[in-house]
Amino acid sequence: MRQTITLACAETGERLYLTSKNKRNTPEKLQLKKYSPKLRRRALFTEVK
């Protein structure tokens, strides 16, 4: 079952992106590189509750 998760920037802490993932297939926390408007560059975003 897919669940909606929030992605937060590792450097600034801002929560900008929503995505979904299947927790059965990927139990570890998701990490994606996304654009951060505050930093004006791509940064690492990690899954938060």
Swiss-Prot record:
GO terms for molecular function: structural constituent of ribosome. SUPFAM superfamilies: Zn-binding ribosomal proteins. Keywords: Ribonucleoprotein, Ribosomal protein. Coiled coil: none annotated. GO terms for biological process: translation. GO terms for cellular component: cytoplasm; ribonucleoprotein complex; ribosome. The keyword Membrane does not apply. InterPro entries: Ribosomal_bL33 (IPR001705), Ribosomal_bL33_CS (IPR018264), Ribosomal_bL33_sf (IPR038584), Ribosomal_zn-bd (IPR011332). NCBIfam families: PRK00504.1, PRK00595.1, rpmG_bact. Belongs to the bacterial ribosomal protein bL33 family. This is Large ribosomal subunit protein bL33D. The lineage of its organism: Bacteria, Bacillati, Bacillota, Bacilli, Lactobacillales.
